[in-house]
UniProtKB/Swiss-Prot annotation:
Its EC number is 6.3.2.6. It holds the Pfam family SAICAR_synt. PROSITE patterns: SAICAR_SYNTHETASE_1, SAICAR_SYNTHETASE_2. Pathway: Purine metabolism; IMP biosynthesis via de novo pathway; 5-amino-1-(5-phospho-D-ribosyl)imidazole-4-carboxamide from 5-amino-1-(5-phospho-D-ribosyl)imidazole-4-carboxylate: step 1/2. The gene is purC. HAMAP family: SAICAR_synth. One of its GO terms (biological process) is 'de novo' IMP biosynthetic process. This is Phosphoribosylaminoimidazole-succinocarboxamide synthase. Keywords: ATP-binding, Ligase, Nucleotide-binding, Purine biosynthesis. Belongs to the SAICAR synthetase family.
Length: 297
C-alpha cells in the first residue's frame, strides 16, 4: 500500500519505489518495504527495508562523490514525516535506457552467459572460470532497462553505443567502473566483497550525466563476507540473493519455470533478510542502523 501524500502528486509505482512530483524540477522518491525477485513483486514485506535502502544510498552517494541526482539531505523539510528516512528529494532527469552493471566476480546472469558462450556481454573471458571467480579487472556489462514485469537482458557495449551514442556510452562505462572500484575498495576494508552492482544514470537539462536511483543497496548489489570467500562454491551473502535462494529451494515448493507467482516468504526468511540488509549497512558504513532517521528509529 503506497503512502497517501496530500501535498504531492503520485506519478508512478515501481517494484519497490513510489514516485511523486514535488515541483517542476524535483521529485520525491519513496522506498517501500516491498521486495522483488525473478521479475515478481513478492506478497511479503521486509520491515524497515525502505529505510535501509535509503540509508545505504545516502552513505554511498557521499562516499563515491560522483555527480548525482540528490537535491537535498535525508531530513529535507520537503519530505513528509510519515516517509522520513525512506524518501529523498531528487532532481528530475532524462533517464538513460541502459542498466549500467559493474562486475568484479563471475556470478548471476554473467555466470550463465559465460557457461553458455565463454563470454559476458560480448566480452570473451579465459576458459576454466568457475562461479565466483574474480576478474583480473572489473567488467562493464550493460543490460536493457526492462519495464515492470519484464526481464533485463544483457547487451554488448556496441549495443550501448547504438542506443545512446559513442560519447555517452564511453561516459557510462568509465563512470560506472570508477564508482564501482572506489566503493568496492572501501567495502573490502570493512570485510565485505561487492561482487557486482548496477546503476542508473540520467541527464539534466544541460546534458550533464548524473548518477540516479539507488546505489550499492542490497537490492542492487551482491555482498559477500570477505573472510568466507572461495571461488567455485555458493557464497554466503548480505543481499537479495538470500531470498532468491529460498524461492528456488525445495522448501518453497515454487516452480520458477511455471506460470504461478512465488509464495509468500515465511517469517524466518523475512527476519533473516532484514538482519542481512542491516548487517550490510552497518558493516560497510560503520554506522548503527538504529541511528538512522525516520519512523522506526
Amino acid at each position: 500500500m503506497r503512502p497517501q501524500l496530500s501535498d504531492y502528486q503520485h506519478l508512478a509505482s515501481g517494484k519497490v519505489r513510489e514516485l511523486y512530483r514535488v515541483d517542476d524540477e524535483h521529485l520525491l522518491v519513496v522506498a517501500s518495504d516491498r521486495i522483488s525477485a525473478y521479475d515478481y513483486v513478492l506478497d511479503s514485506m521486509i520491515p524497515d527495508k525502505g529505510r535501509i535502502l535509503t540509508a545505504m544510498s545516502v552513505f554511498f552517494f557521499g562516499l563515491v562523490d560522483a555527480p548525482n541526482h540528490l537535491a537535498g539531505p535525508p531530513d529535507d523539510p520537503r519530505i513528509p514525516d510519515e516517509v522520513l528516512g525512506r524518501a529523498l528529494v531528487v532532481r528530475q532527469l532524462e533517464m538513460l535506457p541502459v542498466e549500467c552493471v559493474a562486475r568484479g566476480y563471475l556470478t548471476g546472469s554473467g555466470l550463465l552467459d559465460y557457461q553458455a558462450s565463454g563470454k559476458v556481454c560480448g566480452i570473451a573471458l579465459p576458459p576454466g572460470l568457475v562461479g565466483a571467480s574474480k576478474f583480473a579487472e572489473p567488467l562493464f556489462t550493460p543490460a536493457t532497462k526492462a519495464e515492470l514485469g519484464d526481464h533485463d537482458e544483457n547487451i554488448s557495449f556496441a549495443q550501448v553505443i547504438e542506443t545512446v551514442g559513442g560519447v555517452r556510452a564511453n561516459q557510462l562505462r568509465d563512470r560506472t567502473l570508477q564508482i564501482y572500484v572506489k566503493a568496492a575498495d572501501h567495502a573490502l576494508t570493512r570485510g565485505v566483497i561487492i561482487a557486482d552492482t548496477k546503476f542508473e544514470f540520467g541527464a539534466d537539462r544541460d546534458g550533464n550525466l548524473l548518477l540516479a536511483d539507488e546505489i550499492f543497496t542490497p537490492d542492487s548489489s551482491r555482498y559477500w563476507p570477505a573472510d568466507e570467500y572461495r571461488a567455485g562454491v555458493v557464497q554466503n551473502s548480505f543481499d537479495k540473493q538470500f531470498v532468491r535462494n529460498w524461492l528456488t529451494s525445495a522448501e518453497s515448493g515454487w516452480d520458477r519455470g511455471g506460470d504461478q507467482p512465488p509464495p509468500p516468504l515465511p517469517d524466518h526468511i523475512i527476519e533473516a533478510t532484514r538482519e542481512r540488509y542491516i548487517e550490510a549497512y552497518e558493516r560497510i558504513s560503520g554506522l548503527g542502523f538504529g541511528e538512522w532517521i525516520g519512523p522506526g528509529a
